Amino acid sequence: GIFSKLAGKKLKNLLISGLKNVGKEVGMDVVRTGIDIAGCKIKGEC
C-alpha cells in the first residue's frame, strides 16, 4: 500500500545517498593512492 511505497522510496534514497558517500570515500582513497604513487615515482622511492 501507501506505506510500503513511502518506505521503498525512503530506502531507495538512503541507498542512493549511501552509495554516493561510499563512492566519494573510494574515490578519495584512489586519488590519495594515486598521489602517493606519483609522489614516490617522482622521488624514485617506489
UniProtKB/Swiss-Prot annotation:
GO biological process, one term: killing of cells of another organism
Tissue expr: Expressed by the skin glands.
Main location: secreted
Chain's role: Antimicrobial peptide. Stimulates insulin secretion by BRIN-BD11 cells in vitro. Shows hemolytic activity.
Chain segments annotated as coiled-coil in the UniProt record: none
Organism this protein belongs to: Pelophylax ridibundus (Marsh frog)
Lineage per the UniProt record: Eukaryota, Metazoa, Chordata, Craniata, Vertebrata
Key words of the record: Amphibian defense peptide, Antibiotic, Antimicrobial, Cytolysis, Disulfide bond, Hemolysis, Secreted
InterPro entries according to UniProt: Antimicrobial_frog_2
Intracellular or extracellular location(s): Secreted
Record-given protein name: Esculentin-1a/b
Keyword Disulfide bond: yes
Family: Belongs to the frog skin active peptide (FSAP) family. Esculentin subfamily.
